[in-house]
Amino acid sequence: MAISTPSNGVSHVAKPLPNLKEVNKGIETDSEDRAFWWGALSEPLASLLEANHYTKEVQLHYLRWFYQWILPALGPRPLDGKPYYGSWITHDLSPFEYSLNWKEKSSKQTIRFTIEAVTKQSGTASDPINQLGAKEFLEAVSKDVPGMDLTRFNQFLEATNVPNDCVDDAIAKHPAHFPRSRVWIAFDLEHSGNLMAKSYFLPHWRAIQSGISANTIIGDTVKECNKADGSSYDGSLNAIESYLATFTRPEEAPQMGLLSNDCVAETPGSRLKVYFRSSADTLAKAKDMYNLGGRLKGPKMDASLKGISDFWYHLFGLDSSDPASDDKVCIGNHKCIFVYEMRSSQGSEPDIDVKFHIPMWQLGKTDGQISELLASWFESHGHPDLASRYKSDLGTAFPKHNITGKSVGTHTYISITHTPKTGLYMTMYLSPKLPEFYY
């Protein structure tokens, strides 16, 4: 077994990973940057793929693909404890995030990850705010991802980019505590060996520079996707905007933070996603935000509301028979995230699916406690195999994190929704804690 020693000096025994060992035999590390990222990220990925029953062939394919494409896209390695560019994805400033997707009606879990593509030009005079990294990466990797289409990606990138002659102004106005990120890219690693790419656009650079709100930038960009045949996102946008108008105090209003699309060819009913941050510290507030104050209705919404209620009661140990439990404050200062997945339609009614993201590192619970709560949840929803191994899987994937001890923050968010096809649908987002253990 391999012995790993993190920056805190405590040694941990890492589980042998035969597929990773096989991949390692066939590669020659050609740079210190690639060697650093591979050393930090390959073992968790290999462990998660193995634990979640991907075939050997598919595991080898994904590990080799990851080495070939993702490591260079992460850019130069950190130096002297500081990242090369300084963008981040997670609360602990890691530029990478894993996730594990669970569907109630499926026996398989899907591994995913998110990055921000960075180049040697990022942060230099050639590309001061990293507006080129994502495009360069996706154009290159698209040759190796069948079905990838960048039409809408390019449209959204242009809509949220800062004009070249205004970049200096944007930098001067940019608050020090704001993230430097421009575009995130995520991949779903399907068990078939096929990849699904998604892109996420942060509009805050453009908003700061132009004085136009992020809500307006994203709303206008979505409206530009309406079609001449009458299919549009107007019904969904109108429902969202009508709900936002009910907040009379700007500081209490949900804030739009991300616009997302799937990097595939557009089809009728193509989905777009908008992300809002909101102070949903009680279940009552979360449900109001989830259904846009009652604007989203029907059996599918009823099932979703029941699902998030049941999980909320389970997570916080509340009594579902006590009406007061819906108004009990359970989350601190950090805001929850609501994702409105809109599909184009011919009518005026909204066509929206919603996901609710809870900030797990803010709950006063260790990763071990969260793992045990999730295990009992999976057990009660027909997944005893996942329940029995979830905590140990995390401990194996992240041996430096001390999952069974007092670790906090490996779980970043957990999202939940419900669809007729999947039943309950949850994603556990996981930080590799790169600054803590590798910088």
Swiss-Prot record:
Annotated metabolic or biological route of this protein: Secondary metabolite biosynthesis
Single Gene Ontology BP annotation: alkaloid metabolic process
Ranges that cross the membrane: none
A molecular function GO annotation: transferase activity, transferring alkyl or aryl (other than methyl) groups
Enzyme class: transferase
Disruption phenotype: Abolishes the production of iso-A82775C, but accumulates siccayne as well as chloropestolides H to K.
Catalysed conversion reaction: siccayne + dimethylallyl diphosphate = pestalodiol + diphosphate
InterPro entries associated with the record: Aro_prenylTrfase (IPR033964), Aro_prenylTrfase_DMATS (IPR017795), DMATS-type_fun (IPR012148)
Induction remarks: Expression is co-regulated with the other genes from the iso-A82775C biosynthesis cluster and probably controlled by the cluster-specific transcription factors iacI and iacK.
Entry binding sites for substrate: 88-89, 97, 112, 198, 200, 271, 273, 275
UniProt KW keywords: Transferase
Family: Belongs to the tryptophan dimethylallyltransferase family.
NCBIfam families the UniProt entry points to: arom_pren_DMATS
Name of the protein in its database record: Prenyltransferase iacE
